[in-house]
Amino acid sequence: MSHLDNGFRSLTLQRFPATDDVNPLQAWEAADEYLLQQLDDTEILGPVLILNDAFGALSCALAEHKPYSIGDSYISELATRENLRLNGIDESSVKFLDSTADYPQQPGVVLIKVPKTLALLEQQLRALRKVVTSDTRIIAGAKARDIHTSTLELFEKVLGPTTTTLAWKKARLINCTFNEPPLADAPQTVSWKLEGTDWTIHNHANVFSRTGLDIGARFFMQHLPENLEGEIVDLGCGNGVIGLTLLDKNPQAKVVFVDESPMAVASSRLNVETNMPEALDRSEFMINNALSGVEPFRFNAVLCNPPFHQQHALTDNVAWEMFHYARRCLKINGELYIVANRHLDYFHKLKKIFGNCTTIATNNKFVVLKAVKLGRRR
């Protein structure tokens, strides 16, 4: 846990999933503190919109203003709810919207934590363009190293005149005034043909590797299991290309597409609808934190290309949680397949959780591993 003192309230904040005590990661950063400083003496009139509040630092600090927390991460929503409870703040003080929803009209203040991907930032700025006014105070923040010329140009292009502050504690802010500059329409998704198939893959703004098939998924697809039956999971599904291939290779199976990103799940659904509509009755789509809340002993197989970062931080906490949930939700003799960078050494992590692990395939960068749920472990 970490403490954040600001002009609104003193907070105790925790990351979600929690990090270990040996290598703790903080649940807020200097950019959060810097953003809150700008509002200390500001009268807030109209709705407060907070975008990409990773662990709820801004939402908790501004809870008395009933802010809207907008983002594309269900884990961030869970983190914010947990930190509201931790600080004795009514959860209903914050209204949660995902990035595909319509934003509230005429906000008084918009606070943006600059996301990792420029595509998501552009989608969010275009959504803001429809609701902000010239009186809306628009402030964005990030580590100074993550604010580039292209970031500032995007604010200018979509919203209007933009300036940046001096760095403070290695953080920098962006101030923007809306004046409705001319702007061409942009498609909701980016699409590309998947080689070796007649499929067109559609990707919303925040989907990993949205402009083409990433090399890890490409390697994984060469080693996917065939002729499985029952329910199988594409965990951390992204655009659903793994699950789509599983539907094709396993005609007797049902595939459950799971991701914490609403945009990823929307992309997966769109890709099944447009490429294998006949398989929709064998498909389920779920926005979730891994397999949290899913009944145990349900699935025959889980397939996963786990992330090794959360927001801007490198961490295996999310992957570790995925593996534990996968084991809980697999049937006896159910199988977990993963692809990962070789340097992450997931072989020993899986062996610790499952008691076994087999290398299916490897190249100079990636490894495909399989672990089997052999029975109950203490």
Swiss-Prot record:
Gene3D superfamilies: Vaccinia Virus protein VP39. GO terms for molecular function: 23S rRNA (guanine(1835)-N(2))-methyltransferase activity; nucleic acid binding. SUPFAM superfamilies: S-adenosyl-L-methionine-dependent methyltransferases (SSF53335). CDD domains: AdoMet_MTases. Pfam families: MTS. It is found in: Cytoplasm. It catalyses: guanosine(1835) in 23S rRNA + S-adenosyl-L-methionine = N(2)-methylguanosine(1835) in 23S rRNA + S-adenosyl-L-homocysteine + H(+). GO terms for cellular component: cytoplasm. Coiled coil: none annotated. Its EC number is 2.1.1.174. Keywords: Cytoplasm, Methyltransferase, rRNA processing, S-adenosyl-L-methionine, Transferase. InterPro entries: DNA_methylase_N6_adenine_CS, rRNA_m2G-MeTrfase_RlmG, RsmC/RlmG, SAM-dependent_MTases_sf, Small_mtfrase_dom. Specifically methylates the guanine in position 1835 (m2G1835) of 23S rRNA. Belongs to the methyltransferase superfamily. RlmG family. This is Ribosomal RNA large subunit methyltransferase G. It comes from Shigella flexneri.
